Every structure is written in structure tokens, then in C-alpha cells.
């Protein structure tokens, strides 16, 4: 589990319908719950459910950030917002929290609050595009599950999100954009890690748009080399190619 996540969980009890954990932390919590290994991760990726968000959550979150003493407070610009908080005063708090909101005004800031501009890297740009897509946002809202009292995106929904991120970053790199190849590989490998949780009875309803993205992913991934042994993934990971 991510360092400091226990305190985060305790602080936001009662707000479980207002946010969902995605990304590596969601994968880590799910895999740990199934007693399966996952890669190390130090950041917590949070998406706010704008239809449910309350001013009280925003106040509580800002109080939590101040309590943690995060050294770096960053905010992106634009209609949708990314906030990044890094380097807390102790390991009782996650090293990094990244929070995404389709509504830029969810946090109630104090007058003396200083948030520096957040550089838009490939990961932020890609995730923003995915979450602003209505089909993926609807999947996020309907595809949650609770793991030890924490709302996370379920494995069958994390896989399409990871697949879409892989397709998006791969295309951006082919088009000449500056994209870290490690991020592309990370999403691909995570799909195979999560595929261990897929059974013959697993079902997930997808919109036509997301279904087409998954078909494209499965077609393109067939040409990729994946070292399942190094990922500590058993051969059941191969089933993703046969979905």
C-alpha cells in the first residue's frame, strides 16, 4: 500500500461517494486484496465525481493538504483542473497526491494560498483527455468498487482506462511529441497484471466507443513483447489477448 494512505482513508471517511481512486494506487489496493504482487507506486490519483462533490469535501481536502505540510502545491490551467501536492512533512502522508476535477472550483482556498503553475506533461495531458471524454467518465462513475473502505475503479474498468492511455501515449510519441517511453510501457504492463483477475465469467458492459478502443488495443498489443515472468504474472495474463 502507498505510504500514508491509512491517514488519507481515515480523513475522508463519509465522502466515499464524492471521489474515486484510479491509476497505480487503485491497482495496488485491488491486487493486494487478491494477494497478488504489483509494482511500487508512491502517488495517489484521485478523480472527483462532480455530480456528488460538496463544498465540505473541498474544505476538508485543503485542510488535509495544510496538515500534511506538502512542500510543493501545483495547479494546472484550463477548464478541467489537475492539482498536484508533493513532499509532505512526514511519511504519514502520501508522497504525492494528484487530483483531477472537471469542475475547477472544488477546493476552497484561503486568501494566502499559493499554487504554482503545473507543467503539462504527457501523463497529465493524456489522462485529462480521457477523463473529459464522456464515455470514459461515465464508465468511471458506474465502475467503482469498495476495497477496504476506499472507492476504487474496478479491474474491468481500469483495464480499458490503461489500454486507452497506452494507445494515446503511443500515438503521441509516433506523432513526434515528447513522451516518456516508460509511461507507455507502464500502462501496457498494468493491463497484463490486472488481466490475472479476469475469469471466464467476468463481464463488463462497454460503450461502443470504448469497445472500439479495446479492439484496437487488443489488435496492436498482439505485436508487443511482454515479459510476463518479470512482471510476476502467470500465464493467465495471456487471456487479455483472447478477450
Where are these regions (language model features)?
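Compositionally biased terminal segments of proteins
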Residues: 1-243
Amino acid at each position: 500500500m502507498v505510504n500514508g494512505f491509512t491517514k488519507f482513508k481515515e480523513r475522508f471517511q463519509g465522502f466515499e461517494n464524492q471521489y474515486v481512486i484510479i491509476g497505480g494506487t487503485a491497482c495496488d489496493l485491488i491486487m493486494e486484496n487478491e494477494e497478488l504482487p504489483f509494482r511500487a507506486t508512491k502517488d495517489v490519483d484521485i478523480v472527483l465525481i462532480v455530480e456528488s462533490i460538496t463544498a465540505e469535501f473541498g474544505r476538508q481536502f485543503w485542510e488535509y493538504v495544510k496538515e500534511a505540510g506538502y512542500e510543493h502545491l501545483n495547479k494546472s490551467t484550463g477548464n478541467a483542473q489537475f492539482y498536484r501536492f508533493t513532499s509532505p512533512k512526514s511519511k504519514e502522508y502520501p508522497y504525492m497526491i494528484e487530483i483531477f476535477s472537471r469542475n475547477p472550483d472544488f477546493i476552497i482556498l484561503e486568501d494566502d494560498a499559493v499554487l504554482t503553475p503545473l507543467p503539462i506533461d504527457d501523463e497529465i495531458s493524456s489522462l485529462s483527455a480521457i477523463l473529459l471524454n464522456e464515455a470514459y467518465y461515465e464508465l468511471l462513475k458506474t465502475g467503482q468498487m469498495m476495497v477496504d473502505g476506499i472507492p476504487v475503479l474496478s479491474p474491468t474498468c481500469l483495464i480499458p482506462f490503461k489500454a486507452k492511455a497506452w494507445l494515446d501515449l503511443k500515438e503521441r510519441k509516433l506523432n513526434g511529441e515528447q513522451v516518456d517511453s516508460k509511461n507507455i510501457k507502464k500502462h501496457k504492463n498494468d493491463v497484463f497484471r490486472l488481466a490475472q483477475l479476469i475469469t471466464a465469467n467476468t463481464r463488463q458492459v462497454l460503450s461502443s466507443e470504448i469497445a472500439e478502443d479495446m479492439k484496437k488495443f487488443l489488435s496492436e498489443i498482439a505485436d508487443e513483447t511482454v515479459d510476463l515472468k518479470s512482471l510476476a504474472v502467470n500465464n493467465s495474463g495471456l487471456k487479455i489477448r483472447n478477450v
